[in-house]
Amino acid sequence: MTGRASAVAARLTPRHPDLPETSVALAHATLRQGARHIAGLAPWADPMGEGPQAVVRARYVGNCLRELDRFLGVLLDVSCLAPRPRLLTLKPDTATRIAVYETDGWDVRPAQRRLRALERSRLCLFHDAGRVGCGDVPQARWLTSGWRDAGSRDLRRYAIGARLRPSALHLHDIAGFYAGLGDRIVSGAPDS
């Protein structure tokens, strides 16, 4: 466990009486480790060419993004602000589940939009080897990815039929986004 995670574990009170005191800190550390793993794929991501290797890379990146989202979901479960955290786990996606933090004075809508874009992107990477087959909504001509280009505040968009090829920069951007979400969630924990 990192020094920061140990410090967080030492001062956090569990939100649910059945969870050990370190659950939030461990879930946070796991999410941060997953983010480091995604960032560590950066040298391997460029260039993401064509052919069978590109298919394997796309599926692997899609799977890693799915696991990173699961780690965020676990952190949400153990640090839930809702009175009945078990009900939160019935929500199908992290973008919906993170809404409980809206009551904490945090406008979660930008994070929700990005989490939904990342969900569509990882499905495209995992199931279609990165080829964009549908847009953000039915009849849309674009898919909004969950990453940004250098110097841009907007998420990158891809036309139908284009290939998603997350670059090293994109993977670092995704890693920073998830790590930042985890930090924000932990900072809202009781007694923190």
Where are these regions (language model features)?
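Extended intrinsically disordered or low-complexity regions, especially N/C-terminal cytosolic tails and loops
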Residues: 1-75, 100-121, 134-192
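Secondary-shell segments that build the walls of catalytic and ion/ligand-binding clefts
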Residues: 123-127
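Glycine- and acidic-residue-rich phosphate-binding/metal-coordinating active-site segment common to enzymes
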Residues: 88-106
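Short acidic alpha-helical/loop segments enriched in Asp/Glu that coordinate divalent cations
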Residues: 73-94, 132-139
